[in-house]
Amino acid sequence: EIVILNADRDGIEQIAETLKQRQNIAAVHILSHGAAASLQLGGTELNLSNIESYRNYLETWFALPAAEANSNYSITAKPEILLYGCNVAATEAGVAFVERLSQLTGANIAASDNLTGSAALGGDWELEVTTGNIETPLAFSAEAREAYNGVLADLNQTTGDFNGLVNAI
């Protein structure tokens, strides 16, 4: 299922609302522009400086419904979040951001420490930094990755068109 965030609304809140309506989510793939220790989610830039202010939302992303939380229900594997965005895990601050996001969501996280996207622009599709074991494959086929002609770079730049990549999922 593909969910496109409204660019005029808080993206962290939108993701929380979306995940609250679903159960047994194994993985969430987030396609966004990024920078070191920062990710654009809808109309919100989530970063190391403001992540604590979103704690209440982030902690609900994979929370069990009350009935399941009070039963013998258990999840055998941690959920996973794959962050497709340039340089999100670059620098010590970037790694700290990814680790804190993992702690708050309870998910294993995979993120990139370099450009994500077209090899012709110096990018790749490897998510080099992880906070745990990531078993989920990339969301995009090899053909879609090769066809994408941009990178998911700095939040202040427009580099690449998401439409071709989103349509390829």
Q: What are these model-derived regions, one by one?
A:
Residues 1-5, 85, 153-155:
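Short, basic, glycine/proline-bearing loop/turn elements
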Residues 68-70, 149-156:
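Low-complexity, Pro/Thr/Ser/Gly/Ala-rich linker/spacer regions in secreted
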Residues 111-152:
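Caspase-like cysteine protease fold
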Residues 153-169:
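N-terminal, post-signal-peptide segments of secreted/periplasmic proteins
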Residues 26-120:
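Catalytic cores of nucleophile-dependent amide-cleaving enzymes
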Residues 17-21, 60, 64, 167:
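A generic secondary-structure signal
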